[in-house]
């Protein structure tokens, strides 16, 4: 069973996504506080991490950096993990590519997406070697 960590302070949306993904057969961990996520994150435990793009305590990129540092502490070299940023905003991919070229368009998903599209997107990210 594939394992997913969802970190988002938008409780309604994250609970909805958790329910959708559990119904699709995924094992889910949901954390609504990004600072708690930093302390609970275990490298290698999750097939993908879904993170809120804009959160009140820190944005998704800040959390990614913190999780990356946690993964470095485990064995001295960072263990790669897949991440997808969830956002309700319109995404300017060109501007994001200049700031974070390591993330392609597939690493973002709209919070306004339909259930089937969301599950399909998550499955494709888990399956890809990106």
Where do the model's predicted regions map?
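Two-component/phosphorelay signaling modules centered on CheY-like receiver
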Residues: 11-29, 103
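Acidic, metal-coordinating helix/loop segments flanking the phosphotransfer/catalytic sites
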Residues: 30-48
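Alpha4 helix (beta4-alpha4-beta5 surface) of REC/receiver domains from two-component response regulators
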Residues: 62, 78-79, 89-110, 116-120
């Amino acid at each position: 069973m594939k394992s997913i960590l969802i970190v988002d302070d938008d409780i309604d949306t994250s609970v909805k996504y958790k329910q959708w993904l559990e119904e699709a057969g995924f094992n889910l961990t949901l954390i609504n506080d990004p600072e708690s996520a930093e302390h609970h994150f275990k490298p290698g435990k999750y097939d993908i991490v879904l993170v809120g793009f804009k959160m009140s305590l820190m944005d998704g990129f800040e959390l990614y950096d913190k999780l990356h540092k946690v993964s470095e502490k485990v064995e001295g070299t960072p263990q790669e993990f897949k991440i997808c940023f969830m956002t309700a905003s319109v995404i300017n991919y060109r501007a994001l590519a200049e700031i974070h070229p390591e993330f392609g368009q597939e690493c973002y998903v709209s919070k306004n997406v339909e259930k089937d599209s969301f599950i399909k997107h998550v499955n494709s990210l888990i399956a890809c070697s990106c």
